[in-house]
Amino acid sequence: GVPNWDVVQVEAEELTLGCADGFYEKLDWDKLGGKDKFLPAAVNDCGVGAIVWSTAIAYDGDKLKEGPTSWADFWDVQKFPGKRSLRRGPKYSLEFALMADGVPPAEVYKVLSTPEGVDRAFKKLDELKPHIVWWESGAQPLQLLASGEVVMTTAYNGRIAGINKSEGKNFKIVWPGSIYAIDSWVILKNSPNKDAAMDFIAFASQPENQVKLPEYVAYGLPNKEAANAVPAALQADLPTAPENLAGALALDADFWVDNIEELNKRFNAWLAQ
């Protein structure tokens, strides 16, 4: 049938699945200036990155003068006594556990793609399990941090920057070992306005237009030229700032599309133990 919408912003797994299943039109990359203009993780036959957002460690700089700097610190309840908070589910939790166990970011999905790697991640989660408060919605971790219920948490970078700005908090982000994900523009299959939709995506993807986004919300920019043009005062809060991107890991949507069902079952069984 004819879709109700022409252009939609989708998360990484939705992009992977929808493109494979023929739900989206193929993009005209010539209109976008070529694939090399964008972060590699922002490039797909059916979609182009719209925003980049990260999940990272956050802590209250007013309460912890010397905060954590790594996932090993997040797991170290002797050095940093108190509860921690993680997003409920295997996605992110398993990657963070492997990094806490010494796996370099670039090798996380290689390790996690083996049965031994999955066992290793769950074994590492076992260590922290008594100290974890699980969160499910994006507002929860910052509420837990503000109330003092947890000493550190994972959280979305845009939320952290937003509450610092709106409520004068001093929540700090630990960028090394953060995981960034990209939401992408797609055109729904059989859109009657395909050409206009492509023109809109091209307009939204131009560096001079993307560069305005961080003034309103601390999302990173998939267009490399736009990311480099962000004013210095705003760069520190963005996943795409060069120093923040350097130690970060791109979410592997293909891995999660292939493994989410099985790992969800295992995670839920583990949680119930």
Short names for language-model regions:
Residues 54-63, 98-100, 182-196, 212-216:
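A bilobed periplasmic-binding-protein/Venus flytrap-type ligand-binding module shared by bacterial periplasmic
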Residues 16, 72, 119, 123, ...:
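Solvent-exposed, polar/charged alpha-helical surfaces in well-ordered, non-transmembrane soluble domains
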Residues 243-273:
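Conserved C-terminal helix/tail region of periplasmic/extracytoplasmic solute-binding proteins
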Residues 15-17, 152-170:
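A ligand-binding cleft/hinge motif common to bilobed small-molecule-binding domains
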Residues 2-146:
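Extracytoplasmic ligand-binding site segments that recognize negatively charged/polar headgroups
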